[in-house]
Swiss-Prot record:
Top-rank taxon, per record: Bacteria
Alphabetized UniProt keyword annotations: Cell inner membrane, Cell membrane, Membrane, Transferase, Transmembrane, Transmembrane helix
Localization terms from the record: Cell inner membrane
Main localization of the protein described in the UniProt heading: membrane
Lineage summary: Bacteria, Pseudomonadati, Pseudomonadota, Betaproteobacteria, Neisseriales
Pathway entry: Protein modification; lipoprotein biosynthesis (diacylglyceryl transfer)
Protein name: Phosphatidylglycerol--prolipoprotein diacylglyceryl transferase
PANTHER family cross-referenced by the UniProt entry: PHOSPHATIDYLGLYCEROL--PROLIPOPROTEIN DIACYLGLYCERYL TRANSFERASE, PROLIPOPROTEIN DIACYLGLYCERYL TRANSFERASE
Entry EC no(s): 2.5.1.145
Transmembrane segments: 17-37, 56-76, 92-112, 222-242, 255-275
Pfam families for the chain: LGT
InterPro entries, sorted: Lgt (IPR001640)
Family: Belongs to the Lgt family.
Length: 283
């Protein structure tokens, strides 16, 4: 079993200011978005100009942060934040939702398209290939922080990883399983899937490869965005089987996690959109 290193979440401290790994992962994601966006502009495969890309980045950042935070509040801990509404603003304590961030970016794209007279679906197609590497960067941030770890796996599995940060969850799980209790006593922690790395590979690298390569050729308007939508939903749904469900939610109907249920509409809409848009002429 590999033991997680327990990195210090703060990379650099300068007086009262602290640069955190997780914040750095977001910054890297935005840098990658800009780099890929400019490459697509140079290839003539974008509705952006260099100036409008920089302008959109501001809109996108707001969509990610506001949507991600509100999504976490609404989808995962609504009752807690309803009782303590001021805690919503304590973003330094963590708590972001991809699905909320996705909706926030969609709203930003819609507003930006109206302001600049760009077709909404064409803008969605342009943005979609630029996003997955940013998601990959975010999952590396999760891994460095030792958060969002996976479910318990076999002690002899080559991928098994112990997360010291999960000591409370390990003890709680061991109390209901004699074998896990034995492992915990012997090794001091339980073997878990490094699900952050699975999500890095699936939602980040694999999704990027699929959407980027698909969008290198002219496609019917909306089809690239639909591929991203459905592709993310499928990869997230699969990865959730290895990810530990949120302790305050657990597994929901049909034994699925909240992340899986939020991905189901993405899969359905992605498939329907991909087929319907594919019936139209290429843009």
């Amino acid at each position: 079993m590999i033991i997680h290193h327990q990195f210090d979440p703060v990379l650099i401290s300068i007086g009262p200011l602290a640069v955190r790994w997780y914040a750095l992962s977001y910054i890297l994601g935005f840098i990658l978005f800009t780099f890929l966006g400019r490459r697509r502009i140079a290839q003539g495969l974008s509705v952006f100009t260099k100036e409008s890309l920089d302008d959109f980045l501001t809109w996108g950042i707001l969509g990610v942060i506001l949507g991600g935070r509100l999504g976490y509040v609404l989808f995962y801990k609504f009752s807690d934040y309803l009782a303590h509404p001021l805690d919503i603003f304590k973003v330094w304590e963590g708590g972001m939702s991809f699905h909320g961030g996705f909706l926030g970016v969609v709203i930003a794209i819609w507003l930006f398209s109206r302001k600049h007279g760009i077709g909404f679906l064409k803008l969605m197609d342009t943005v979609a290939p630029l996003v997955p590497l940013g998601l990959a960067s975010g999952r590396i941030g999760n891994f460095i922080n030792g958060e969002l770890w996976g479910r318990i796996t076999d002690i002899n599995a080559f991928w098994a990883m112990g997360f010291p940060q999960a000591h409370y969850e390990d003890a709680e799980a061991a109390a209901h399983n004699p074998l896990w209790a034995e492992w915990l006593q012997q090794y001091g922690m339980l073997p878990r899937h490094p699900s952050q790395l699975y999500q890095f590979a699936l939602e980040g690298i694999c999704l990027f490869a699929v959407v980027w390569l698909f969008s290198k050729k002219p496609r019917p308007t909306g089809q690239t965005a639909a591929l991203f939508l459905g592709g993310y939903g499928v990869f997230r749904f699969i990865a959730e089987f290895a990810r530990q469900p949120d302790d305050y939610l657990g597994l929901l109907t049909l034994g699925l996690s909240m992340g899986q249920w939020l991905s189901v509409p993405m899969i359905v809409l992605g498939i329907v959109g991909f087929v319907r848009f594919g019936m139209k002429k290429q843009h």
